Regions:
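Nucleotide-activated chemistry modules centered on ATP-dependent adenylation/adenylyltransferase
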Residues: 1-207
Length: 207
């Protein structure tokens, strides 16, 4: 399933305003090895519900940094059980307790922050992608989250040529709230990403 940038641009124009479920069904139809990634942050339930409603057995890759809030872990367990998620868990090679003893969580201005991000997020993510080798990657990127994400669209290509599909790209928080309410889906806002710290920073997965 290979598309040129020109084809992707044309498809993005066609998909604007199309329900997420239809975009997902289109992508699943052409995908040979799709997956969806999640960190169970706020509104992740939308992409997980929508994708697994179309493809119930799709691999759900969760790269757990080890630094999630108790609320996030409880939320994750609730969604895994409720949506019957086929979770593939990836964790850092070093435990958070070990890292806390020798490094802690460096601030974003600390030179060690890049190494910290590599250890807890980027390396586990690369390992997951190398093992699954997806051709379609469902994610919940949305316009307005960061400057980089504002430059993307519903469909985009990763640096490795994987087709990223963000069916809720044009949804704002109010629209997602309505989506969740209509489907009686839970949300959780007590979330912290130590690799980003600030809401408008990128962690490196989508750069």
């Amino acid at each position: 399933m290979a598309f040129t940038e020109q084809e992707i641009h044309k498809l993005n124009q066609q998909f604007k305003g199309i329900p997420p479920e239809e975009i997902i069904s289109w992508a699943i139809q052409y995908a040979e090895n799709p997956l969806v990634t999640t960190n169970f942050r706020p509104y992740e339930v939308a992409i997980l519900h929508a994708v697994t409603d179309v493809a119930p057995k799709i691999p759900v890759v969760w790269c757990d940094t080890g630094y999630n809030t108790p609320n996030t872990y409880k939320h994750a367990e609730e969604l895994i059980a409720r949506l019957h998620l086929n979770v593939k868990l990836y964790v850092p090679k070093q435990t958070s307790s070990h890292r806390d003893a020798v490094m802690g969580i460096p601030g974003i201005d600390d030179p060690r922050h890049q190494l910290f991000t590599e250890q807890v997020k980027l390396e586990p993510f690369r390992r997951a992608m190398e093992e699954h080798k997806p051709d379609v990657w469902f994610t919940n990127l949305r316009q307005g989250q960061t400057a980089l994400r504002d430059s993307l669209d519903i469909l985009s290509l990763s640096r490795d040529g994987v087709l990223k599909v963000s069916p809720f790209y044009h949804f704002n928080d109010s629209q997602l709230d309505a989506y969740l309410k209509d489907r009686n889906l839970p949300n959780e806002h007590k979330y912290f990403d130590p690799t980003k710290v600030l809401e408008n920073r990128e962690c490196g997965l989508h750069t």
